[in-house]
Curated annotation (Swiss-Prot):
This is 1-(5-phosphoribosyl)-5-[(5-phosphoribosylamino)methylideneamino] imidazole-4-carboxamide isomerase. One of its GO terms (biological process) is L-tryptophan biosynthetic process. Its EC number is 5.3.1.16. CDD domains: HisA (cd04732). Keywords: Amino-acid biosynthesis, Cytoplasm, Histidine biosynthesis, Isomerase. Coiled coil: none annotated.
Amino acid sequence: MTQIIPALDLIDGEVVRLVKGDYEQKKVYKYNPLKKFKEYEKAGAKELHLVDLTGAKDPSKRQFALIEKLAKEVSVNLQVGGGIRSKEEVKALLDCGVKRVVIGSMAIKDATLCLEILKEFGSEAIVLALDTILKEDYVVAVNAWQEASDKKLMEVLDFYSNKGLKHILCTDISKDGTMQGVNVRLYKLIHEIFPNICIQASGGVASLKDLENLKGICSGVIVGKALLDGVFSVEEGIRCLAN
């Protein structure tokens, strides 16, 4: 069954939203991250997603203390991402009580290290974030979306799915933080070619209709801005996906 996965992006402990990953286009929300996550959990969310934007910019400033507090205080699964560049960071996050760690650019830039991490921590602990841009084909972006790689999305998926990959988080960058609706076509395509991979859709969720369109295609739909802005609630999202 498709789950709604509420998401928070944090800079220095503050809840923020960026548009298309741009730190200059930042909106700060006056929410306490722990209270917000507890609210989402109480509403019925089974998984939560956290992006450490401080750590993404500077790994030496990763918000470990806050992440550990959040992981310990919520009883549902917490998944964390944000520019994770090393095996040590993955281990440290899992030691904090995080259920899954999201790794991105590393999958493209250092496949050897990425495979080592998959092998060492297991496919249930790792989510590959593949941020895509449509050129002539879907290609994977790296470096916090600032550049397109020469790697085609389907080729990357083919490579890793043969090496035991189970979970991906796929974002259509053109949609992220825009609330323009999700790219259903992209997720359908992945689901048809790689039926055994659990897809988390992210970017552009603007209405319950988007959730409805992804039902049965994705294992999870990450929702940030739409929940923070009160477009719909976690309860409404769960009901929509259950029907």
